[in-house]
Structures are given as structure tokens and as C-alpha cells.
Regions:
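Short N-terminal binding/cap micro-motifs at the start of the first secondary-structure element
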Residues: 13-17, 22, 31
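Short beta-strand-to-turn element immediately C-terminal to the catalytic PLP-Schiff-base lysine
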Residues: 23-27, 50-51, 157-160, 191, ...
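N-terminal, positively charged, Ser/Thr/Ala/Gly-biased leader segments
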Residues: 1-17, 135-138
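Short glycine/threonine-rich catalytic loop with a Thr-x-Gly-x-Asp
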Residues: 68-71, 209-223
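Active-site-proximal helix-loop elements at catalytic-domain edges
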Residues: 24-49, 163-193
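Anion-binding (especially nucleotide phosphate/pyrophosphate-binding) glycine-rich loop
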Residues: 37-68, 193-198
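Catalytic strand-loop segment that frames the active site of acyl-thioester-processing enzymes
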Residues: 185, 196-205
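Acidic, low-complexity central loop/insert segments
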Residues: 56, 62-180, 227-284
Length: 284
């Protein structure tokens, strides 16, 4: 049996860059081994599979290495694919461990993440990952603690003193992959924060990918991390808007926006441009 997979670029910046994702709309899911093989064949950080389910869609995500619980840029790509097939609107998505939604209008899609939260890092874990990233304590920003952020997946956040510090991070891929899989951490996120603007990278050894140009899942999780650390500026409605820049060091510039309330452990709305489908579907 063959499967049709389309390619979309999520979080493009003024029509350029973006993060590619495969999208497979199917009547029934392929078996797990086939979905993993398709993800490997596509070669993107994630490929998303969706089938009709109750009032919405049952959704699963695969990296080239394994299934992942949630992927932001693939969710936006899915939103664009669903809008192409069914028309612009809101779509309910049942993930493995959460229920979310995605909407699409014209070239912009918005997802609602699983509840976003964070917790502190122990010193031994922090030192382990600093060593993996060839960083010292002196590289860390004094204004925020390193931490673990969650919004469907776990992300390790390393706030650094400058954008150039973020750009210069290199890491031991094999050591990172082993440790991240042991600790159930999906990405390492070095970042620099100026007000409500975040410049960051997504190191994805756990998914067999050196770096992901952009991930909405990490953006949502970091929104929760900043909220928990009282690092956001809220409007009169007690909402905060964040702007993320990612992928620059890879030559794949990506822009994301996030909207979240001041209430802890609540979802984050992540938006961005989506381009595609790019070329004809791949039949696998």
C-alpha cells in the first residue's frame, strides 16, 4: 500500500525560510514501523499522520528516530493541509496524551498547546548539559535560571547572555543523544531574551537531528517557563505576547508568535506563517 505525504514549511519569515514537515492524511494509520520508515524517508525533523476521529482528527508525530508526543511546526503544517482539504477553520486534534486544536486562515495557522509549565534544574543535570554544550556557568544569563520547560514534551532551557553566545553553541551530538533519551528531554534550547522577544535554537539530538530550525512545541513550553519565572509583561487583559526568532544560524529563518495568559499551567497559542504544499506529494 502506498501513502501520500505532502511537504509544508511552517513558521516562514516573510515567505522565506521555515521548517519543513511531512503531512500524511490517511483513512487509517499505517503501522508504527511504516510511519517511522516514512519519517526517515522524508528526512524532516517530524512527519505528522492524521486520520478522522470523532469530531476531529487523531494525530501522531514521528521523527526519523522515534515517535514524539507533540510537534508544533508539524501541527501548523497539518492545519494548512486540513484547511486545503476542508476549508479554513478550527480543527480538534487528539494526540497521544492531550487534546489540542489548530486553526488556519489564508497563510497563517495557530495551535493551542498542551498546558505549559516548568520546573527547576538540579545542579548536577545543569552541569552535565553545560559540558555537553561546551559551556561554562559564566555563559548563563543572570536574570533567569536554567530550567526544564514542558508543553507536551520536555525541553531544557539555557538562557545565555547574548545572541552571539546562542549562535556559537556547538555540542557533542552522541553524548547529547544518549543523555537526552535517558532524561526524556526532547530538545536543548539555548536562548537570549530581550523583553518579550526571544532568540533561540533547538538542538534535537534525541530525534537524530542536529538542529531543528523552529519548533512551536518548544516555544509554547518556553512561554510557560517565562510565566513561571515572572519574566513576562502582561497587557490589561493579563495576556502576554512573545515573539520568537529561530533558525537564523542554519540559514532557515523562522518567526513565531505566542499568546498566553498569566494563569499557570494553561495552554499557549502559537502562530506562524505556513507555505505549501511544496511540489507534488511523495508516494511511499
Amino acid at each position: 500500500m502506498s501513502w501520500s505525504v505532502e511537504t509544508y514549511y511552517a513558521f516562514t519569515r516573510k515567505g522565506a525560510g521555515g521548517n519543513p514537515a511531512g503531512v500524511c492524511l490517511c483513512d487509517t494509520f499505517p503501522d508504527d514501523a511504516t510511519m517511522l520508515a516514512i519519517a526517515k524517508r522524508m528526512g524532516f525533523s517530524e512527519t505528522v499522520f492524521a486520520t478522522r476521529y470523532a469530531e476531529g482528527f487523531r494525530v501522531r508525530y514521528f521523527s526519523p528516530a522515534a515517535e514524539v508526543a507533540f510537534c508544533g511546526h508539524a501541527t501548523l503544517a497539518l492545519g494548512k493541509a486540513l484547511a486545503k482539504k476542508y476549508g479554513d477553520g478550527d480543527f480538534l486534534l487528539q494526540l497521544n496524551h492531550a487534546r489540542i486544536d489548530v486553526s488556519c486562515t489564508d497563510a497563517t495557522a495557530t495551535l493551542s498547546s498542551p498546558p505549559a509549565s516548568s520546573r527547576p534544574l538540579t545542579q548536577d543535570i545543569l552541569e552535565r548539559y553545560l559540558a555537553i554544550c561546551h559551556l561554562s556557568d559564566n555563559a548563563l544569563a543572570a536574570s533567569l535560571p536554567a530550567g526544564l520547560a514542558f508543553a507536551g514534551n520536555l525541553h531544557l532551557v539555557l538562557p545565555l547572555q547574548s545572541r552571539s553566545d546562542v549562535d556559537e553553541v556547538s555540542y557533542d551530538f552522541d553524548a547529547a543523544k544518549t543523555q537526552m533519551l535517558t532524561d526524556n528531554i526532547l530538545t536543548l534550547v539555548p536562548l537570549h531574551i530581550t523583553g518579550n522577544e526571544i532568540y533561540m535554537r533547538n538542538l534535537f539530538a534525541a530525534g537524530d537531528v542536529y538542529e531543528d530550525p523552529a519548533t512551536g512545541a518548544a516555544a509554547a513550553a518556553i512561554g510557560g517557563y517565562l510565566r513561571d519565572n515572572q519574566a513576562l509583561n502582561y497587557d490589561e487583559s493579563l495576556n502576554a505576547t512573545l515573539h520568537f526568532m529561530q533558525g537564523d544560524v542554519m540559514g532557515q529563518p523562522c518567526s513565531l508568535a505566542a499568546l498566553l495568559s498569566s494563569e499557570p499551567d494553561t495552554p499557549v497559542r502559537v502562530s506562524g506563517e505556513v507555505a505549501g504544499p511544496i511540489s507534488s506529494p511523495v508516494l511511499i
